[in-house]
From Swiss-Prot:
Classification via PROSITE patterns: GATASE_TYPE_1, GMPS_ATP_PPASE
Assembly information from the UniProt record: Homodimer.
Protein name (record): GMP synthase [glutamine-hydrolyzing]
Enzyme active site: 81 (nucleophile), 176, 178
A Gene Ontology cellular-component term: cytosol
Domain GMPS ATP-PPase: 203-395
Pathway field: Purine metabolism; GMP biosynthesis; GMP from XMP (L-Gln route): step 1/1
UniProt keywords, alphabetically: ATP-binding, Glutamine amidotransferase, GMP biosynthesis, Ligase, Nucleotide-binding, Purine biosynthesis
Origin species: Cupriavidus metallidurans (strain ATCC 43123 / DSM 2839 / NBRC 102507 / CH34)
Amino acid sequence: MHDKILILDFGSQVTQLIARRVREAHVYCEIHPNDVTDEFVREFAPKGVILSGSHASTYEDHQLRAPQAVWDLGVPVLGICYGMQTMAVQLGGKVEWSDSREFGYAEVRAHGHTNLLKGIEDFATDEGHGMLKVWMSHGDKVTALPAGFKLMASTPSCPIAGMADEARGYYGVQFHPEVTHTSKGREMIERFVLEICATKADWVMRDHIAEAVEKIREQVGDEEVILGLSGGVDSSVAAALIHRAIGDQLTCVFVDHGLLRLDEGKMVMDMFAGRLHAKVVHIDASEQFLGHLTGVTDPEQKRKIIGREFVEVFQAEAKKLSNAKWLAQGTIYPDVVESGGTKTKKATTIKSHHNVGGLPETLGLKLLEPLRDLFKDEVRELGVALGLPPEMVYRHPFPGPGLGVRILGEVKRDYADLLRRADAIFIEELRKTIATEQDAAAGLCEANQVGKSWYDLTSQAFAVFLPVKSVGVMGDGRTYDYVVALRAVQTTDFMTAHWAHLPYSLLGRCSNRIINEVRGLNRVVYDVSGKPPATIEWE
């Protein structure tokens, strides 16, 4: 049985980052709403509790409080931003509205020596005070400490930016240690979880396989399972894990809608049917999908058509498998959290995979979600541990509608053929081009990134087909061919993104190869838009 940390969510946009930091310390944790019952908290039996931030005001919203059981358990508690404020109020301190709000970067001075911040600092002042570079986002502030607490940190505009009751293991910080802008934040969360809560760092994916396999076998018994295999990371890892558990009781259905990446169908079949010896039904439905997309230019309409056709094709195939009692999905933990589907009284909706939404009810199948407790990086780690090739597990995200939303306007087979070849060249060049010291000196990458491929240094990269023609010259002849745009971004969370500053030499090779090797294209452009204002995908 793993030690557990309970994270109570008060509505912060970055609560998932808290959980990721805890998991990165190899400690299991779960996010649950702040209004869970005392009974739930006691039954969860955490080794420690973390209270998240919130957009709410502590003194205006008296409903957003931690359950009393949190304070009765006798385990350490860390309050972050709003979490610190509700800790103060619930334990007898005072919180007031501040006319000097703090949003963004700040420097916090540590006071005294506390178990949480001992030895953790970004720099020291001439007077010897330890200073921390942090990220603030608050309007209210604690103005009176609860009994038993001492001052732990401050800023000029927030005299109580941190507080500690060492005897009970209660700590509050007004800043956000979970975000990357707080440079020592990861160390603080690790200190709280590993040392103050005294948890065992035993949440390791390689060890998780045995537990997951046993759980799947207990759930499924001798019944059969079907899974929609897309070639994406989540469905691929789910398929490999379920196959490890129940072998031929799993049937994967791989639908080729004609909008996949170059050789993707072959790669999926080679991996699952060839290497893992899994049962895979390969359906070429490209004519059906492309036929229904004829004349359609609206992006949302294209998505709906592709989703609808997938459901029809998958449903028809699933009905042939009369012995199947389970539908497996690659749902991961962020999907569960965002849909309110955590393991509490609020677990009313499950965010279905975009391709199979509604299918469990339609087909009368039970739902199997073996990855629902894992974050994306944990899913990738699990995939490698299961023997999937890293180039499959660490592929960039690919939209469910595939190239259908990377072809602007109407989708045609010819357009898809041109795009997938251009996209493959771009990805190939990114994979084989290694970041150099010259790239670092030019500010294109960090010094510690030298030696990595530019594919690994970008979060997502792809080509976009533009249905416009431009004039060009090839040899002695004039051409009038199509244009492709290359897009590469760097991001930590995909909520915001910077366009990747790729070396000109790399972009030049991509352009030369695409124009020379893909007949029908004569111009290549590079997208230098960030998110916001642009989105990562064009449609």
